[in-house]
Amino acid sequence: MLPAPHTCCRLLQQLLACCLLLPRFLLTVLLLWLLDFPCVRRRVIRGAKEEDPGAPEREDPPLCVSDTNRMCTLESLKAVWYGQKLDFFKSAHLGGGAPNTEVVTLEGQRLCRILDFSKGHRPLVLNFGSCTUPPFMARLQAYQRLAAQRLDFADFLLVYIEEAHPCDGWLSTDAAYQIPTHQCLQDRLRAAQLMLQGAPGCRVVADTMTNASNAAYGAYFERLYVILDGKVVYQGGRGPEGYKIGELRNWLDQYQTRATGNGALVIQV
């Protein structure tokens, strides 16, 4: 018996994704393997200890990975492959419609949709991440400051997704918290409450246990978006290296300057 047409189409999509992603994945594997050599790691990754203690706090501090962390493991490769596949199959694209996926509020645990938080013609900033992602947590206060400074013309929403480095998966000793993989919605909501403690005053919601928002926006490990009038007008790079609060600040500054210009501002990154 021949498989159904939609099954064949899905298999072909998966095969195409594997062919396109495999070269990039293998390069990532090589990089992770090299980073397990301390001499290479110290040369490639600038640790926070190299920064001038008297310098002002940076919005996007350099990546810092302790020598105790293994980079090339089965769990790390599974996480990298998963993130690359999510990015390939995401439905959110610059200039296209914003996926209106379901999320859960922390207060009242009410099911709603992402675009419910969009108000009129104001930009809606989406910040996807989790407490076990060190680069995300290192930039959380910078995001909080930016949100406080731009609330007069933009809205901000933190979306808590699945853990980047769960303690029962790709463990990171640099993570602010040791949290296992979420087994139920309550696990995710408890973790999201920890994030809220680190960013008081920010609006936080949690992705559903189907990970619909994470998949639609290709958000794993962390990612930034701006939605305006139902369209994606800013799409940040995939974290950790593409996750840049400073770049988001520049976009918002340009938008504020040109808000009275011709139409919405769309910036490719």
Swiss-Prot record:
It is found in: Cell membrane; Endosome membrane. GO terms for biological process: hormone biosynthetic process; thyroid hormone catabolic process. It catalyses: 3,3',5'-triiodo-L-thyronine + iodide + A + H(+) = L-thyroxine + AH2; 3,3'-diiodo-L-thyronine + iodide + A + H(+) = 3,3',5-triiodo-L-thyronine + AH2; 3-iodo-L-thyronine + iodide + A + H(+) = 3,5-diiodo-L-thyronine + AH2; L-thyronine + iodide + A + H(+) = 3-iodo-L-thyronine + AH2. Its EC number is 1.21.99.3. Residues 36-269 are extracellular. Keywords: Cell membrane, Endosome, Membrane, Oxidoreductase, Selenocysteine, Signal-anchor, Thyroid hormones biosynthesis, Transmembrane, Transmembrane helix. It comes from Aquarana catesbeiana (American bullfrog). This is Thyroxine 5-deiodinase. Belongs to the iodothyronine deiodinase family. The active site is at U133. Pfam families: T4_deiodinase (PF00837). Its main location: membrane.
